[in-house]
Amino acid sequence: MNFYLKTTLFAALALLLTSHAGCKPHAAANRTEAAVSLDTFHLYDQARHRDVPVAVYQTNGKRNRHQKMVLVSHGYGENSGDAYLYYTFLTEFLARQGYFVVSIQHELPTDSLIPMTGIPQVVRRPFWERGADNILFVIKQIKQKYPDRGFEEITLIGHSNGGDMSALFPQKYPGIVDKIITFDNRRMALPRSSRPRVYSLRSSDQTADAGVLPTAEEQALYGMKIVALADMPHNSMCDQATAAQRQEINRHVLAFLQEKKH
């Protein structure tokens, strides 16, 4: 095998291995803690003729009439159909803190797979656009289904490809969400804005494309927070995380959510 072919194959393999979150169902993915209720159901968007499965996590304790909504978008799951259940360590934790948590299944088995070649910002843009449309649809449907909750604040959380679509959302649909928190999105540029507030947790083994992350000057100007985690592989930012990694992610996310508006 010549050098050029070896190099090409290596590059292709590297892209394949780092192109999606790589999360798998965890043993606890189908079990919710006693303090948290889980309700899974399908929403159907008639305008787009699309099924959107969701999982709603709520505390079983006293619920605030003015709950804050958190929408979680999973990393690329190769159309497995259950990737929205790969983040129970986070969704259950936030539900216990009183948040109304909705995890969205963005990929369906009948969807096309995300392209592994080409310029990501071009070939993957339609997938992010669809994800942003899913998020908007779910927000509207949840508000109708739970009219007594108020939902005074809405936050988007997204891992990897889900972070890319979460970063796109406020740029496509401004004025709807209050905060976005991404877990190591690497392709879609984070919005440079003070509303929504922008936060991002960065892995210890992957880098973002040029222009995705704000400069130090932009962070200071807009109040954006980019946190580099020392021992946090990209593929561990889900239920595959160790107990220590889960605790670290939850700690940062809760701090971001509790940060007051300026």
Please state what every model-predicted region is.
Residues T8-T18:
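Bacterial N-terminal signal peptides
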Residues H20-C23:
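N-terminal Sec signal peptide cleavage junction
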Residues P25-R65:
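N-terminal cap/lid segment of alpha/beta-hydrolase-fold proteins
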Residues R50-R149:
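Serine-hydrolase catalytic machinery in alpha/beta-hydrolase-like enzymes
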Residues K140-S194:
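Primarily recognizes the serine-hydrolase "nucleophile elbow" in alpha/beta-hydrolase
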Residues Y199-R202:
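Short beta-strand/loop motif that positions the catalytic acidic residue
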Residues T207-P214:
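Conserved alpha/beta-hydrolase "acid-adjacent" motif
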Residues G223-H262:
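C-terminal catalytic histidine-bearing segment of alpha/beta-hydrolase fold enzymes
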